[in-house]
Amino acid sequence: MDVLKHKNDTTHTIVAEYNTRIKTYANKEKKVIFHSYSNLKGYGQEKKKNSLIEITEEERERQRKKNLYRTKMNIVDLIYHNGLKEPWQYFVTLTFNPGEVDSLDYDVVVKAMRKWIDNMQHQNPGMSYVMTPELHKSGRVHWHGVFKNVPNWNLVQARTPGGRLIKKNGLQIYNLTNYKYGYTTVSEIQNQEAVSVYVSKYIT
């Protein structure tokens, strides 16, 4: 594992392992982004803070919102620019069956997602992706993201228990049988620019 710490930065550390970016803010809150690109431009770059100066809760919250906005904009750029020459194919939501993965445990969820992504890369060597976590009000974590170059994915049309096809805004919804940890929804991407903003909104 490579641990990358920005020079003159005392507020956080970025950990790079495989295709993971983990950002720890000053309040110890962590955000994990999975993606298939070697560099997430500008991610986590902050000015040095004087550790001897006590930060008020108001200032801490202001910093958190500023960092969150920067992270969202970086994700928008990452998805948008890497979809210009070769468009993204699928928007994906992955949730966890509590009997398979304890989605209340953030570290367990990250480990399971990393394992699944590694497996998908092995099956689809040219796969590109960006995945971001969303924390539900219940405390459970699920994931949203975009993918392309996944010829060995097995997609089946999603249906209600009565057999009716499930569609959203007129588009067919699919289930991904390659995912064994829980439940999936997959849709074909129609608007490359809109999907970059759509994924970033789940980062909270």
Task: Label the predicted regions.
Residues M1-L78, E86:
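DNA replication initiation on ssDNA origins
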Residues F34, W88-F91, F96, F147, ...:
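Phenylalanine-focused residue identity feature
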Residues E57-E86, T95-N97, G170-T204:
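Catalytic "initiation/cleavage/transfer" segments centered on a nucleophilic residue
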Residues I14-A16, I22, V92-L94, M131, ...:
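Generic structural hydrophobic/aromatic packing signal, biased to beta-strands
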